Each structure stands twice: as structure tokens, then as C-alpha cells.
């Protein structure tokens, strides 16, 4: 699945040997999340093994965003969600457990949680607001 300018470098990295690819471009691919939080939950991954979102090239970031838009259209027609969360964890303190950057596109549905206000702020539930 490599393309010019892209490389799947690390044989020990699960995200460097993808399965169930939904769509791809020269620099990134999208696939279902293995630990789906809701119907249609997808991750978008650069093909180059890079740990940090901020270490991705401008071209890789653009390729990832292009696929986010593409899979959003597909999720919308297939699952009809009421909203979305987009997330990326950078560093262990932020919850990154796989050191190959990937963005989550998580479809949200009315009633999937009792009170969705705050969105991803729920990650830091109980922390005082500044």
C-alpha cells in the first residue's frame, strides 16, 4: 500500500501494516477503529511512521484532512450521525498509546450520552475550569 513519498516503515507497528482500509490517498489511509466508541468510528493515519501530529509534513496533514472529509461523507450516508468528534492524542500525558499518529473521527448520536456538553472536555472530567 505504499505510494510515492509514503512509506510504511515499522514492521512492529500495527498502524504501519494496516488492515480493512476504507480509503486512501498517496500519504494517508482510513480504516475502522479497532476499539470503536460508536458506529462508524474511523481512524485516519499517515502512511509514514511518525509519532507526533506536529511532526507531520504540511502535505501529510493536508492528506489526513482530505481523508477526514471523505470518510465523513461516507459515515454520514451510512450511519446518519447527529455530530462528530475529531481527536488526536499527542504524547503519553495526552493518552497516546500507539506511537504512530492517527486522528479519530467519532460519529455522535443524540442520546449516546446523557449530557454531551463539553465534548472532548469529558476527558478531563472533574478538573476545575480555568
Predicted regions and their residues:
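HIT superfamily nucleotide-processing domains
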Residues: 1-130
